[in-house]
Amino acid sequence: MDLLKKEYTGVTYISGPLLFVENAKDLSYGAIVDIRDGTGRVRGGQVIEVSEEYAVIQVFEETTGLDLATTTVSLVEDVARL
C-alpha cells in the first residue's frame, strides 16, 4: 500500500453491486476506487453518490466474498475538481 493512499474501512452495507461506506465524504462523485476483500483480492469500482454520512460505490465485478469487517476501499483516480 502506498503511504499516501487513504484507505476507508467503514463498509456498512452491501447490496448487489453497491457498497455503502461511512465517513468517506471526501471521496468525489465519479472517483475510481479499489475494493479489497479480506483475502487480498482487488475489485474495481466507482463512486456514484456522496453524502454527509456515506458514499455509495458501484462495484464493477461480483461482490461475492466481500464482508463488512474486512473490506477496504482506496482511491485509485480522483475526478477533476474546479
Predicted regions and their residues:
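Acidic-enriched and Gly/Ser
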Residues: 1-7, 13-82
